[in-house]
Curated annotation (Swiss-Prot):
GO terms for molecular function: nucleotide binding; RNA binding; RNA-directed RNA polymerase activity. It comes from Influenza A virus (strain A/Chicken/Scotland/1959 H5N1). The lineage of its organism: Viruses, Riboviria, Orthornavirae, Negarnaviricota, Polyploviricotina. This is RNA-directed RNA polymerase catalytic subunit. Its EC number is 2.7.7.48. Residues 55-64 have a biased composition (Polar residues).
Amino acid sequence: MDVNPTLLFLKVPAQNAISTTFPYTGDPPYSHGTGTGYTMDTVNRTHQYSEKGKWTTNTETGAPQLNPIDGPLPEDNEPSGYAQTDCVLEAMAFLEESHPGIFENSCLETMEVVQQTRVDKLTQGRQTYDWTLNRNQPAATALANTIEVFRSNGLTANDSGRLIDFLKDVMESMDKEEVEITTHFQRKRRVRDNITKKMVTQRTIGKKKQRLNKRSYLIRALTLNTMTKDAERGKLKRRAIATPGMQIRGFVYFVETLARSICEKLEQSGLPVGGNEKKAKLANVVRKMMTNSQDTELSFTITGDNTKWNENQNPRMFLAMITYITRNQPEWFRNILSIAPIMFSNKMARLGKGYMFESKSMKLRTQIPAEMLASIDLKYFNESTRKKIEKIRPLLIDGTASLSPGMMMGMFNMLSTVLGVSILNLGQKRYTKTTYWWDGLQSSDDFALIVNAPNHEGIQAGVDRFYRTCKLVGINMSKKKSYINRTGTFEFTSFFYRYGFVANFSMELPSFGVSGINESADMSIGVTVIKNNMINNDLGPATAQMALQLFIKDYRYTYRCHRGDTQIQTRRSFELKKLWEQTHSKAGLLVSDGGPNLYNIRNLHIPEVCLKWELMDEDYQGRLCNPLNPFVSHKEIESVNNAVVMPAHGPAKSMEYDAVATTHSWIPKRNRSILNTSQRGILEDEQMYQKCCNLFEKFFPSSSYRRPVGISSMVEAMVSRARIDARIDFESGRIKKEEFAEIMKICSTIEELRRQKQ
């Protein structure tokens, strides 16, 4: 029988069919090799957009810098970064006029945050440029290394543990004539392996002291390391993203805190909220425009796209914005917030690993590090690379490129959103003073513009005026990539709007399935994903039930835990069958132990262990939840864990799921091969750091989360806490006198050791 596929959609409103257009099956593309070429592209492009600016030289580092601010007004439609200071300031003033007190209140909120934030805020985040080792490290390690170097150079403000004091150290470090750092290096030697009798390369790690003069230190402090952005779909070319070092991060954090506080108060801002809250906020703006245009006016919406948003933004412009926003605030606060944009005006982009050369005939490979690009003969490169290198050469210093204009990806998302909203805000009739007016939505570089006017000419005029106003502040709306529609149908940040936001369930497809963490977490994440999609993405009951059955099937194949009474043979089936036969209450067995699946769409919110607890045999309960089981290296599991789920589009999302600790919550051991590499010293530092943090958590468990405040070090805080707890336990009879005395003695010994060290 031939089925006409259009019949399937007779009962479905057209907008709900969006999930059938899903293009993203299969794995996203990942980048391999070096990101040097992409970074050079970014640097060269950014300079090209601002080429008519003024060149100056940084007196401290000798870096050539291009300043496009207040440059020539654009005469064509090419993207450009010539923002006009007075226009930006005026846009800020009008934004404040329409939202009285917005800047004042946000400054007060931020001031409170600045005074309370502790330096461990900087340990959040993944890879961070570690300036002491000149490469990327986990954030916690990079911070620890920075603090260690500061200490050994006599900077100790940070011992208080407040972020603001760490930033004082950063400022002081920039005035020092030289900074001494400890860096890791690798020695290789060829030795004969006793067992195989072959020659092998043995690597040993050394630590050596190195002095950096003021210029070298400043270059490192202002460096952003670059990497290639992975897993980007729908693009032919990869692009570079940046990761800043610890000197810049703290300052950026405070600026973004201020900008976030402003965005929260702006109805046109798509940040910092997300999900359903964001949809509700945006639907409001659309509703407002449609209600006002009902009878007499036309209303059109542009699904907007900006050309190279962050390469045309300029840190100097952000400095002007911050200066205006904080104009009535205390001097110290204004200074702290203005440092981030100043550092970005003087930033250096590290070019990454350099190029790899291969000689097919001689079977040789050699790496040309970025530092050599300034002097190497260009005859070895192909034409496009040669052009890139020639262009970037005047900007190179020590393997980094001076990059004053532009912002690099993902740095000031909130603040640039404030700038975008300030232009949307100018669309009110009292500012346009004509028959057309506009409003819209802005989320970082993505925007939707809604224009209302009595006729088509008015709509055109409104769009033109918006376009030109944007140009004045360095925003370039792309005429090629933006499209216009009657209001009611548009796309914004991958949300599709058609008389209301349409649930695009297919975007969530990649997050269905088995995550591969461990049996316990995978079961919990799997059912939580289904539950969340029923709540947020119109996943209907029948489809959810099917998704659940497919998930259980997938899970059983992944962990080879088919039901105990199945005919399927795997390498676990012998053990599982035995367990099945010995178990009295078979319904109590977890799916991962060959038990039946008791989940249906009504009980997805209950962790499997809790769901089956009453049904379990007593000895099975004892085995399952036994913290003393020697075969399990236990994570101490909070009641809620976070999983990273990958939607098809947009950034990885963090998702909470219930975690009940059982003997199935195992953690795979770390691969041993790392122990033979240059990472070993770092790994040991990291483990030491981890141990200290775990110990600290023991003394200040999150259930009693009163963080120790004040000027004590971690050790002092733990000792004083131990004394208080011991006294309470002794007085209430929980511990004996001898134990109490022993604890007090240990505390005194620790303090004595600390005194001797100092």
